[in-house]
UniProtKB/Swiss-Prot annotation:
Principal cellular location given in the protein's record: membrane
CDD domains for the chain: cyt_b5_reduct_like
Binding annotation for FAD: 135-150, 174-209
Compartments it resides in: Membrane
Family: Belongs to the flavoprotein pyridine nucleotide cytochrome reductase family.
Name of the protein described by the UniProt record: NADH-cytochrome b5 reductase 2
UniProt xrefs under PROSITE patterns: FAD_FR
GO biological process terms held by the UniProt record: response to yeast; sterol biosynthetic process
Gene this protein is translated from: cyb5r2
FAD-binding FR-type domain segment(s): 43-155
UniProt organism field: Xenopus tropicalis (Western clawed frog)
UniProt lineage: Eukaryota, Metazoa, Chordata, Craniata, Vertebrata
Enzyme Commission code(s) on record: 1.6.2.2
Amino acid sequence: MEISTDSNMLVALAVIGVTVLLFLIKALGSQAKKAPLTLLDPNAKYPLPLIEKQEISHDTKKFRFGLPSQEHVLGLPVGQHVYLSAKINGSLVVRAYTPVSSDEVKGHVDLIVKVYYKNVHPKFPEGGKMSQHLDSLKIGETIDFRGPNGLLVYKEKGKFAIRPDKKSEPKLKVAKHVGMLAGGTGITPMLQLIRQITQDPNDNTKCSLIFANQTEDDILLRYELETVAKSHPEQFKLWYTLDRPPQGWKYGAGFVTADMIKEHLPPPSEDVVVLMCGPPPMIQFACQDNLTKLGYPEAGRFAY
């Protein structure tokens, strides 16, 4: 009897020990997942230092800003953006940007910015105030970040929470296929979403993107986009169109048209969402007007 009792006690102690160990592992794992957030208050400004600057092309650069510690993440939900603000020539300038780095990355955040220099574009002789200011920053100098901001949040597995305006409650929209229309730097929120979807093995949402630019040299994040297209050919389809295509160009030419949308985006459906980001004339005339013509419901469209 004593041997049996001792054995039972040992078994009971072993079970308790394993249970406690599993609890501790789960608790520690849960804590490890919750990295400290940088953006705690969407109305507060957080000065972040420039820690690296990399030239991507003749007029495009990657700016890496340091977070408060190597353990911090930015804290930006997928679909949201940040505002950068700075006093430039005595005036406050504010611009919206979507990071290209994942929000799971610790210690830093990356922005890809096209720098609009003075006396290059006839319509904008002064160039871009914020982009030139960013380009002028020296390593260690700071700029104010504010966020998260935006009316759209991607939850998971095709679920979007979309607010009609800042005062409204979000409405849930579920999509099996996401159509995307991007122009120029409007590609950044699209890449953010594409990465989130394709990196989640449990997310079967499909994405189809039409990316419009003036020339082949203007295509931002081309390597990143084509890498995803090659590694997820059934889930992500990519199509370019250029105003001035080079000889032998195998993609589209000219503005985004109804025929182009019909060929490269999913057809209108209740389980289709179409996202747009680019210059206002493109959004209105090339995107919205053609989507209306093709019968895409307004409830399934969103322009960043």
